[in-house]
Amino acid sequence: MSTHYLDGWRIDVERREGVPRLVPATVLARTVAAALAAAGAPRPASITLLLADDAELAELNEAHMGKEGPTDVLSFPLLAPADFPDHAGKRSGDGPLASPADGFALPPGARQQLGDIVVSVERAVDQAGAGRGGQTGDVRWDARDELRLLVTHGTLHVCGWDHADPAEEAAMRDLERRLLG
């Protein structure tokens, strides 16, 4: 695992054994930090990015989403969407997540844990190679670009962004495009 301190965030990047190193951890940490900044994430805070394979994502997808088979990215936010600034891509409702406003206070200077992002590098490689990248499933680009997109996408989900309805999706896709340049 490598730890990166950027703009008030601690970003832990962990790569499972056997997972290819498509993009340096420093670049992925900067990708996470850019998405956190764009989403108005609180500081100081911590977030974890786990780079895994299809088998691990399939297990997590079934256990947490009730869906069989692998997926490209899963996010596990620890804050409610209400803890982030309002935006057009904001997830509807707060759901069961607790908020610091609900009575839990951190010690002064402590880092708030934002959540975890788990990406299947195997899925990023397959999607890019088959021309099924870009979240729309029709973009042909390098697997490194697909991985950066998935990291950005997962980070935005941790920060309360969603794509459940057309307006949310348009806002989220627009921000992803701007962040990836």
Regions found by a protein language model. Name each.
Residues 1-148, 156-181:
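An acidic/histidine-cluster motif and surrounding catalytic segment
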